[in-house]
Curated annotation (Swiss-Prot):
It catalyses: a ubiquinone + n Na(+)(in) + NADH + H(+) = a ubiquinol + n Na(+)(out) + NAD(+). GO terms for molecular function: oxidoreductase activity, acting on NAD(P)H, quinone or similar compound as acceptor. NQR complex catalyzes the reduction of ubiquinone-1 to ubiquinol by two successive reactions, coupled with the transport of Na(+) ions from the cytoplasm to the periplasm. NqrA to NqrE are probably involved in the second step, the conversion of ubisemiquinone to ubiquinol. It is found in: Cell inner membrane. It is an enzyme of class 7 (translocase). GO terms for cellular component: Gram-negative-bacterium-type cell wall; plasma membrane. One of its GO terms (biological process) is respiratory electron transport chain. Coiled coil: none annotated. Composed of six subunits; NqrA, NqrB, NqrC, NqrD, NqrE and NqrF. The keyword Flavoprotein does not apply. InterPro entries: NqrDE/RnfAE (IPR003667), NqrDE/RnfAE_oxidrdctase (IPR050133), NqrE (IPR010967). Belongs to the NqrDE/RnfAE family. It comes from Chromohalobacter salexigens (strain ATCC BAA-138 / DSM 3043 / CIP 106854 / NCIMB 13768 / 1H11). This is Na(+)-translocating NADH-quinone reductase subunit E.
Length: 206
């Protein structure tokens, strides 16, 4: 069991990295990766959100939305009820609620990070990496334990990628980059090279 969870975690971090394998969450990934401090802060926020939302959405799917999930209520005909069509709406609602709570927490206790992240903190709500993790969980039929590990791994992988990109971009400020590639141009090339590097993990077998 431990080996299975370890394999799932490593796979989520390196082999199926949300940012560098699936290119999810690119908006905030590119916008907040100019400074390492901001990148780490947003990365931690994404880890927290993913670690909580994926298993919570798993519980919602298991006990409310999937066909026959409402049998525990004892209602007549509950075994035939299928609310899975509400999945997308439910997942987004959970993500939005958690991000709102996180935003209030940072505003109260870590105002410097809250101001540094600015508009990109509430944008975590529509970060497709967050929703994508929940949809992958559904597609792959993960149980609750696997959902916790996968959510944490996906968050750590995204945080690792944005922190690494931020470190490279800080170094690029002191490099002689051609004028036509300055800004997002060289950033896209950097992300592509990082993605190629992470592809080398695809052969890992645990």
């Amino acid at each position: 069991m431990f080996e299975h969870y370890l394999s799932l975690f490593v796979k989520a971090v390196f082999v199926e990295n949300m940012a560098l394998a699936f290119f999810l969450g690119m908006c905030t990934f590119l916008a907040v990766s100019k400074k390492i401090s901001s990148a780490i802060g947003l990365g931690i926020a994404v880890v927290v959100v993913l670690t909580i939302t994926v298993p919570v959405n798993n519980l919602i799917l298991t006990y409310l939305l999937s066909e026959g999930a409402l049998t525990w209520t004892g209602l007549e005909g509950a075994s035939n009820i299928d609310l899975s069509f509400l999945g997308l709406l439910s997942y987004i609602g959970v993500i939005a609620a958690l991000v709102q709570i996180l935003e209030m927490f940072l505003d109260k206790f870590v105002p410097a990070l809250y101001n540094a992240l600015g508009v990109f903190l509430p944008l975590i709500t529509v970060n497709c990496a967050i929703l994508g993790a929940s949809l992958f969980m559904v597609e792959r039929s993960y149980d609750f334990g696997e959902s916790v590990i996968y959510g944490a791994g996906a968050g750590v992988g995204w945080a690792l990628a944005i922190t690494a990109l931020a470190g490279i971009r800080e170094k690029l400020k002191y490099s002689d980059v051609p004028a036509s590639l300055q800004g997002l141009g060289i950033t896209f090339i950097t992300v592509g090279l990082m993605s190629l590097g992470f592809m080398s993990f695809s052969g890992i077998q645990l």
